């Protein structure tokens, strides 16, 4: 089910060990530290391979995440706001990643711009609790979604390039 490129990307993202969500205040801080280390490593790997495609930051508690993601198509950079909350049942429940400005523009999206990850990503996440974290959600959830949906939305004229 996972291709060689995805397998290589995954093998370079550190796995997490601490099983804690926002409700476990003391241990959550340790989990957040692991999350940041994993994200930093993933972004560094992306930069080294020339495939840098997102920036994220969180609120102080690490429960709300926001930033930008972008997709290169025919040498044009399409940029989108990205946001998600960490569910109280995290890491058992994966975060629901949203691209609010694309809300209602594709069938593979729920209300509020949350991308559809049920078929492929959620079963994989469930098998890898607590080892998977935010970096894995970006690599296995948002990245493939962007790769499939954005070219289709561009081709249909639903989204257009915006000059900076």
From Swiss-Prot:
A family per Pfam: UFC1
Domain of life: Eukaryota
CDD domains: UBCc_UFC1 (cd11686)
UniProt keyword terms in alphabetical order: Ubl conjugation pathway
GO BP terms, alphabetized: protein K69-linked ufmylation
Any GO MF annotation of the entry: UFM1 conjugating enzyme activity
Active site per the UniProt annotation: 116 (glycyl thioester intermediate)
Gene Ontology, cellular component aspect: cytoplasm
Coiled coil: none
Record keyword Electron transport present: no
SUPFAM superfamilies registered for this protein in UniProt: UBC-like
PANTHER family hit by this protein: UBIQUITIN-FOLD MODIFIER-CONJUGATING ENZYME 1 (PTHR12921:SF0)
Similarity comment text for this entry: Belongs to the ubiquitin-conjugating enzyme family. UFC1 subfamily.
Protein purpose: E2-like enzyme which forms an intermediate with UFM1 via a thioester linkage.
Protein name, per record: Ubiquitin-fold modifier-conjugating enzyme 1
């Amino acid at each position: 089910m996972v291709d060689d490129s995805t397998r290589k990307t995954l093998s370079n993202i550190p796995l997490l060990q601490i099983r804690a969500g926002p409700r476990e205040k003391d241990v959550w801080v340790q989990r957040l530290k692991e999350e940041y280390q994993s994200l930093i490593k993933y972004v560094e790997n992306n930069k080294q391979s020339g495939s840098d495609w997102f920036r994220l930051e969180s609120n102080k508690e690490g429960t709300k995440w926001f930033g930008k993601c972008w997709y290169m198509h025919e040498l044009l950079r399409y940029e989108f706001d990205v946001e998600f909350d960490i569910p109280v049942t995290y890491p058992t429940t994966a975060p629901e990643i949203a691209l609010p400005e694309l809300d209602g523009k594709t069938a593979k999206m729920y209300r509020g711009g949350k991308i559809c990850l049920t078929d492929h990503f959620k079963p994989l996440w469930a098998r890898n609790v607590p080892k998977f974290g935010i970096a894995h959600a970006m690599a296995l959830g948002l990245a493939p979604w962007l790769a499939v949906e954005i070219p289709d939305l561009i081709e249909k004229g639903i989204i257009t390039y915006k000059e900076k």
